Curated annotation (Swiss-Prot):
One of its GO terms (biological process) is regulation of translation. It comes from the Eukaryota. This is Protein HRURF. May function as an inhibitory translational control element that can negatively regulate protein translation of HR gene.
């Protein structure tokens, strides 16, 4: 599990982009709730 799969990397990029746009910390799961 040390190396993320290609599909995981494809998901991480948009997720981090959204977090940056919404200005929410990625490490805080409570902020990811709708």
């Amino acid at each position: 599990m040390a190396q993320p799969t290609a599909s995981a990397q494809k998901l991480v990029r948009p997720i981090r982009a959204v977090c940056r746009i919404l200005q929410i910390p990625e490490s805080d799961p409570s902020n990811l709730r709708p």
